[in-house]
């Protein structure tokens, strides 16, 4: 399920990075950054269950409702109701709006 989320976010066409950016894209852009952690339940020496929790961060110059809608559409399709808009911030250092959604997924 996590890989499906990654692929769906990449398919939006919004520049994408998993974990962190090595360089920031130039120009007027929307950027999606995905971070996650994994929790497992083990039994009989094997992983029995896995769950992912993470955040999807969208950075933009100005408000672009189409990019916000794309991210929400992907999260709804991949996570069902297991996500929430955690914060909207203005990043003074970069001049970007920063939207952060927190999600949970069952693992494969």
Segment roles from a protein language model:
Residues 45-51, 72-73:
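Short intrinsically disordered coil segments
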Residues 69-108:
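Acidic-leaning, charged glycine-interspersed low-complexity segments
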Residues 42-44, 55-59, 80-84, 108:
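Glycine-rich loops and low-complexity Gly/Arg-rich segments
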Residues 14-16, 40, 51, 55, ...:
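Generic preference for well-ordered secondary structure
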Residues 5, 9, 31-32, 56-59, ...:
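Generic hydrophobic secondary-structure signal
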Residues 48-62, 96-107:
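Oligomerization/assembly interface segments of phage tail-like spikes and tubes
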Residues 1-44, 63-67, 93:
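Small/polar-rich, solvent-exposed N-terminal microdomains that initiate assembly or binding
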């Amino acid at each position: 399920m996590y890989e499906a989320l990654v692929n769906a976010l990449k398919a939006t066409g919004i520049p994408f990075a998993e974990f962190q950016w090595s360089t920031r894209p130039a120009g007027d852009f929307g950027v999606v950054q995905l971070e996650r952690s994994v929790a497992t339940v083990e039994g009989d020496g094997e992983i029995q269950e896995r769950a992912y929790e993470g955040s999807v961060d969208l950075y933009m110059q100005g408000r672009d409702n189409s990019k916000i809608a794309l991210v929400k559409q992907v999260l709804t399709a991949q996570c069902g109701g297991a996500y929430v808009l955690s914060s909207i911030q203005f990043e003074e250092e970069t001049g970007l709006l920063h939207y952060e959604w927190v999600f949970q997924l069952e693992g494969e």
